[in-house]
Amino acid sequence: MPAIIDQDGIGGMQTSIFESGAILLYLSGKTGKYIPSDMKRQVLVWEWLMWQMAGFGPMLGQVHHFNHYAPVKIDYAIERYMNEASRLYGVLDTQLSKGDYVTGDDYTIADMAILPWTKSYARQGIDIAKFPNIARWRETLHNRKAVQKAYEIEAEIEAEMGEKNKTDLRELSGEEWQKLFGTTKPK
């Protein structure tokens, strides 16, 4: 679970925040960065952040689970989540046809929240060529120095984790499986 502790938080006190959307809202509110100052545009950013938190992220998580980790292949679940993933990519592509970034001409926390979920589009079974606005947006964001730095840090962490960074979750121990999925590991 993503979490931060701001040593100089609310009222100058240590403040802990968990969940990525809450962290992004907190940091943008505190710094005034990556969120518009006028309420109308701010609400648009909130809407797209919530779209990612409640729809895009969870549905793509289900695609990954049923395609790659479920001990039994369930055709209905695979088809249902693949169709929903494709639909959501279409929604995002349509939105991105209106501007350089998710909510228009400015890079915001909505872009920050959505981009990582598109990293594994091929593994999600998505043909990115069918979504040209997403492809353009991804390229634009990948050219940002901060995004490049984030991916460098991710690669460093993965390298440090070595064997612990298991790409096939079926290789997890029973205890690791229980912590991740909340159930006993299937035989």
Where do the model's predicted regions map?
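GST-like domain detector, emphasizing the conserved glutathione-binding G-site
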Residues: 1-83, 93, 178-187
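GST-like fold's C-terminal all-alpha helical module
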Residues: 48-145, 152, 187
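N-terminal, helix-rich and Lys/Arg-enriched segments in bacterial and organellar proteins
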Residues: 20, 49-51, 137, 151, ...
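Alpha-helical interaction segments
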Residues: 16, 38-41, 107, 127-128, ...
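Alpha-helix/helix-capping structural signal
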Residues: 22, 145-146
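Short secondary-structure capping/turn micro-motifs that flank functional sites
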Residues: 43, 137, 157-158
